[in-house]
């Protein structure tokens, strides 16, 4: 009787080899697939980073996609002006030119969601006229006292172009548009040999309980903080400072048992607004131990140290970048640096460095 393998044994061996090879392929694929979780408090710039990834790595937005942003941009613009006009009432700030009252009524008559391909010309004219009023400008300067979209001034300054009949949103218009993120959105893109699956989760408090679904096998956390909000209060709770909320959230994420082995990249975002605010809104009013006055570098160092010092793990490194999420050139450079960090972390985890 021969000692050769039976047909059944050969088939079993072949199946085992195929399973082992598939497991190896899966492991290689996992190493090349980066699961990145975008975290941060509401309005910190997470969705803007995702839009930048589309611009930088996916060839940008098609004409149809740009068209789809029109209603969002129109609604953002009208709603922002309405917020200012309502704030003028509560802050008891009058219009300088009472003839503007007609335009104010036009703005208040608009629905919350503007529909259509063109902003009605009377609405564009009303916003353009009212934005020039000194009373409106004075109220805008006090925007930290109420909840105003960061992009308000940008859209008001560009209202003539936005209200034109042939208007087509450009990259900046799209990047600055704001829709509250609810639930979890996933974006996939490729950088070099790595495939990124980037998850954006709602930043408002009511959305945070949904983050748990994203936690498994996360390679990296990209945590965003709007440092320009050091003097603002939460949308959901106007007794809580936004920067304090971000510090509390970062503490809970950085030191969570879920993320002991997860690399964390911290984007200290909205540096353009931060630099503008420092001379007119002293940081010491909100953080009494800060001693740097309106010096931009000193203020950046202070905030950086406040976040990094929360890390309780000696072996865990927090990678930090100061960013302006609407600046495509800068985000392209920063994300290239992030990619290098992730490659190094992958090699280290695989024992290759």
Curated annotation (Swiss-Prot):
Question: Could you say which cofactors this protein requires?
Answer: Mg(2+)
GO BP annotations listed: G protein-coupled receptor signaling pathway; pheromone-dependent signal transduction involved in conjugation with cellular fusion
Region feature G5 motif, mapped onto this chain: 323-328
Q: Which residues bind Mg(2+)?
A: 47, 181
Q: For GTP, which residues are the binding ones?
A: 43-48, 150, 175, 181, 203, 269-270, 272, 325
Q: Where is this region: G1 motif?
A: 35-48
Record bears the keyword tRNA processing: no
Q: Where is the lipid attached (S-palmitoyl cysteine)?
A: 3
Q: Name the GO cellular-component terms.
A: cytoplasm; heterotrimeric G-protein complex
Residues with a covalently attached lipid (N-myristoyl glycine)? 2
| Origin superkingdom | Eukaryota
Q: Which residues form the signal peptide?
A: none
Start and end residues of each stretch annotated as G3 motif = 196-205
Keywords assigned: GTP-binding, Hydrolase, Lipoprotein, Magnesium, Metal-binding, Myristate, Nucleotide-binding, Palmitate, Transducer
Q: Does the keyword Nucleotide-binding apply?
A: yes
List compositional bias (Basic and acidic residues) regions by residue number: 7-25
For region G2 motif, the annotated ranges are 173-181
Q: Which GO terms describe its molecular function?
A: G protein-coupled receptor binding; G-protein beta/gamma-subunit complex binding; GTP binding; GTPase activity; metal ion binding
Disordered: where is this region? 1-25
- Ranges for the G-alpha domain? 32-353
Q: What Pfam families does UniProt report for this protein, alphabetically?
A: G-alpha (PF00503)
Q: How does it assemble?
A: G proteins are composed of 3 units; alpha, beta and gamma. The alpha chain contains the guanine nucleotide binding site.
Q: Which family does it belong to?
A: Belongs to the G-alpha family. G(q) subfamily.
Biological role: Guanine nucleotide-binding proteins (G proteins) are involved as modulators or transducers in various transmembrane signaling systems.
What protein name applies here? Guanine nucleotide-binding protein subunit alpha
User: To which species is this protein native?
Assistant: Colletotrichum trifolii
